[in-house]
A protein has these predicted regions:
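Soluble "head" domains of membrane/secretory-pathway proteins
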Residues: 1-133
Length: 133
C-alpha cells in the first residue's frame, strides 16, 4: 500500500531515485497497468548493467556507479538482463524494481515515456508508515 502525490510530476520531472507510479509502456496484457518502480536512468543517459552493478553515463559524459543500499537483495550476476546496455531518448526514463531478481521493469519492456508517469510515491504503509527515500 502506498500514498503518492499526482501533482508532483505536473510541476517537476522525475528525478533519479524517485519511486514513481506509472502506466506500463509495453503492448500486451499489462499495457496501461499501474506499476511502482524506482527511477534509475534519466532522458539522454545510457544505463549499463554489468554483473548486477548499475552504471549510468549521463548526457554530459559523467559516469555514475549507483549506490543502491535500498535493494532488498543482491542482484544475480548470471541473469542476462543484469548484463545489458540501454540508451534513453529525450523523453525516456529507465525504471527498475528494488527486488531486482524478481522485477518486471525496463529491462524487460523498455524505457518509460514521460507522459506515462502518474504520481510520485511519498509513503508506503503496512503496519505503520515509512517515508520513501
Amino acid at each position: 500500500r502506498m500514498i503518492g502525490l499526482r501533482m508532483t510530476y505536473y510541476f517537476t520531472d522525475p528525478k533519479r531515485g524517485d519511486v514513481a507510479i506509472f502506466k506500463c509502456p509495453a503492448e500486451g496484457p499489462d499495457y496501461g497497468k499501474l506499476y511502482v518502480k524506482r527511477v534509475i536512468g534519466l532522458p539522454g543517459e545510457t544505463v549499463t548493467i554489468k554483473a548486477g552493478q548499475v552504471i549510468i553515463t549521463t548526457a554530459d559524459g559523467e559516469t555514475i556507479y549507483l549506490d543502491e543500499s535500498y535493494l532488498n537483495e543482491t542482484p544475480r550476476e548470471d541473469l542476462t538482463v543484469n548484463n545489458q546496455t540501454y540508451i534513453l531518448g529525450d523523453d525516456e526514463y529507465f525504471m527498475m524494481g528494488d527486488n531486482r531478481n524478481n522485477s518486471t521493469d525496463s529491462r524487460f519492456w523498455g524505457n518509460v515515456k514521460r507522459d506515462r508517469f502518474v504520481a510520485k510515491v511519498l509513503f508506503k504503509y503496512w503496519k505503520g508508515f515509512e517515508i520513501i527515500k
